[in-house]
Amino acid sequence: SFIDVLLFMQLYPKIVVITSDWVWKFPLFAFTLRYAGYFPSNNGYDKLSSDLLSMVNDGYSVLIFPEGTRSYDENILRFHKGAFYLSEKLKLDILPVAIYGAGLVLSKQQNFYLKPGCVTYEFLPRIAYDNNSFGETYQEKSKSVRRLIIDKYNSLFEEFATPANKYYREKLIYNY
């Protein structure tokens, strides 16, 4: 979601984002993304690789959401393999991030209605591009990293899916 992109931009300003194609259909978003130097994923990763490598050499990090879209039900979707392909092709490490709560406070069904709640990001250990413990191919790495993120997401769920989280507190009060 665009809330994820905004939060990541606050963490590290030298970031280039590969976004889903649908975001570019909204004129305001498209203008902002183009101005920021972001890329739509429909350009194809082979076409983007030289531009991305140039930006990485200038100190930028590449941000890709491998699910490609948000989930309707908070379950982590299958990962597309483009991020892992780029990691292998451009020799870039992967920094997996588990995000909990963004889909609750800004659900896919109510795209522009921000609800109160807690959003947390957990950065997992960096994976070197040549680390084969997650798989020999980028396809295998995609599946292994997805499992790693699901495990972390589940632990974040255990920690934050309580009445102390404003999102759940509001739901609890609303239901009684």
Regions found by a protein language model. Name each.
Residues S1-G44:
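Catalytic core of membrane glycerolipid acyltransferases/transacylases, capturing the structured
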Residues Q10, D46-Y176:
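Non-catalytic C-terminal accessory region of glycerolipid acyltransferases
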